[in-house]
């Protein structure tokens, strides 16, 4: 299985088809299909500002014309992208608040420490969450946000390794 994994091929597998971004990689294409369905449907249904809320599974995951979105056990309700999930649940305003919160954390760090080294911890966590359900679960968000709190609270005591001298 590991011999078949070709990351470079997947990265260059994206193309436009009938106005939609698609991929020759089945997993990437499956996720792109869900994400685009969520965003397009929100614009079509006028939910850009309010989102779907938190009381139900996204309609796109229940779409009978796209079997398999709920997974083999029928329990998969996540869209596998934290930004799309935030946008779909609470609309553009909630997505703005998410970005403003993280920008505030970064600016606080910058003002206290005069560098952007906190990005070494924030960016990888967010990138992973763009492609999987890490921040849509229970454990990872607790670890992530408690770590950020601890790191920011003790920023003057924490010695961050200087990477560039």
Give the residues covered by each predicted segment.
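Hydrophobic alpha-helical segments of polytopic membrane proteins
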Residues: 1-3, 107-110, 147, 165
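A membrane-periplasm/extracellular boundary helix in multi-pass inner-membrane enzymes
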Residues: 1-22, 40-45
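Long extracytoplasmic/lumenal interhelical loops at the membrane interface
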Residues: 21-90
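Short, flexible micro-motifs
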Residues: 54-56, 94-97, 140
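A short hydrophobic/aromatic micro-motif that marks alpha-helical segments and, especially, helix-coil
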Residues: 60, 66-68, 104-108, 146-147, ...
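Hydrophobic transmembrane alpha-helices and their immediate junctions
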Residues: 86-126
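Transmembrane alpha-helices of multi-pass inner-membrane enzymes
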Residues: 101, 118-130, 134-165
């Amino acid at each position: 299985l590991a011999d078949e994994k070709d990351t470079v091929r997947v990265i260059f597998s994206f193309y436009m088809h009938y106005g939609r971004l698609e991929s020759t990689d089945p997993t990437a294409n499956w996720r792109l299909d869900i994400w685009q369905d969520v965003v397009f449907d929100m614009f079509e249904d006028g939910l850009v500002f309010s989102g779907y809320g938190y009381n139900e599974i996204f309609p796109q995951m229940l779409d009978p014309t796209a079997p398999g979105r709920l997974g083999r056990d029928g329990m998969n309700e996540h869209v596998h992208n934290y930004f799309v999930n935030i946008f779909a649940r609470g609309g553009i305003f909630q997505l703005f608040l998410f970005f403003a919160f993280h920008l505030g954390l970064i600016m606080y760090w910058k003002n206290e420490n005069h560098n952007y080294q906190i990005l070494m911890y924030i960016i990888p966590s967010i990138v992973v969450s763009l492609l999987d359900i890490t921040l849509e679960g229970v454990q990872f968000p607790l670890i992530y946000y408690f770590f950020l709190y601890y790191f920011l609270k003790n920023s003057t005591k924490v010695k961050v390794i200087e990477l560039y001298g």
